[in-house]
Every structure is written in structure tokens, then in C-alpha cells.
Amino acid sequence: TAYAAKHYFDEIHYLDIVDCNAGNHHKAFATNFNPEINIREITQKGLYYENGKYIETEPMEIHQPLTYPNIGPRESYLLHHEEIESLVINFPTIKRARFWMTFGQQYLTYLDVIQNIGMSRIDEVEYKAPKADGTGEEVVKIVPLQFLKAVLPNPQDLGENYEGETSIGCRIRGIKDGEEHTYYVYNNCSHEEAYKETGMQGVSYTTGVPAMIGAMMFLKGIWRKPGVWNVEQFDPDPFMEQLNQKGLPWHEEF
């Protein structure tokens, strides 16, 4: 978004962040990162920004097919993702900002079951468990979602058999020199290539590499000034250059 604002727009009006995982890990149900965080994130209410206010939606209420490069159309669901909250502050011409993520029908079916049987609960429940010394039972307290995390596949172990790719980008509409323009910047990341390089799947790769680059920008003094800042408040050019060099090459469509 910052790169687009610097190079291609006088005003950004509409921003859609689009996140597609078109991979297959060959598991009946698994999350690509911490199950506790992932399930809580997608079962909470959706949120987007429009005309100066935030609009809340029911979980997964708003969805539409979006077409992703080299992947094709995938059903995409509006979620609450916190980066929108800073972007609309730092780019105040934005009229609407939304975040979209893809999910397959099998994943959503399992998610419905998890919710319906109470396994997505984050409050404590009492459970009778055998005592460690084998002398009987005792009442212990467990959080259902934390227990579910313990029995689901470990996201770190998914990479070996993961096939396909991710596609993450920003679709932007705004004004440059008095005329309306559209711009799409995105990266596609192969799960197989990510595993060959790091032993991890593509979702972990696309999460970790940008964070590493941000830390490098700070440590080298490229991104450093007094106070607390979000990444979009710094010069985007060196960051985008490093994405190309560190395994996440990006592409543009106008």
C-alpha cells in the first residue's frame, strides 16, 4: 500500500488485501499456523472500513469469488485483519478497506463442526482426568480450543507434503493526476520451493520473510526514527527491493 501511494497514486480510495492459499497439505483438517490463533481469527466477527467508520459483519458472512494469478477463481471471505486499522489512519484518503482470505468448503465444514460441538470455546471447562499416580480421578480445568490445538497436526510438520502455492496482494483503486487508476501488486509463493529452502510450508514462509526484512531494515538503520511507527510509515522502496532478493518476488498489474 505504501509503495503504491508513493509511486502510483495521489489518493488511494479503495483497498482490498487479498490472501489465497491454493495449496494442499493432504490432511483432513489442519491449520497453517497456530490453531488457537487461526481458529479464533476466523470465527470472530468480520470488520471492514468504509466512509469513515468500521462496519462489523457476522463471521464469514460476506464472501465472493476472486481470481488469483496462476490459480484462478477462489471463494474469498471478508475477515477482520488489524492492519486495516493503521492503514486508514496513515492513508486518510482511503474510503474503503477490506481484507479477504480464501477457504475451501471442507475446511469450513470442519470449522462448523468444531464450533457446534464447543471445541472452539476459549473459556475453561471442568473435566475428570486420571490422576498421575493412578490412584483415581481428579477434576481438572481445560480450555477446549487449547485441547484441540494439542490433537491437531502441528503446522510446522505440514511442509513436506504440501503442494500448490499462495497468492497475497493488494488491489487498489484511486486517483493520479486527476484520473482514476487501478493497481494490483502481488506475490505467489510455492509451498514446495518454500519447503526446499527452509523446511517449512509457504504460509510460514510468507509470514516470516517480511518480518525478517523489517527487522533487518531496523537493525541497519534504514527504518529508524524516534517514536513508535508502523511499517507503512517508512520508505517502502528498500523493503520491496529486499522482497525480490529474499524469495518473495512481486508482480504488478495496472
Which functions belong to the PLM regions below?
Residues 4-254:
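C-terminal catalytic/substrate-binding lobe primarily of soluble NAD(P)-dependent oxidoreductases
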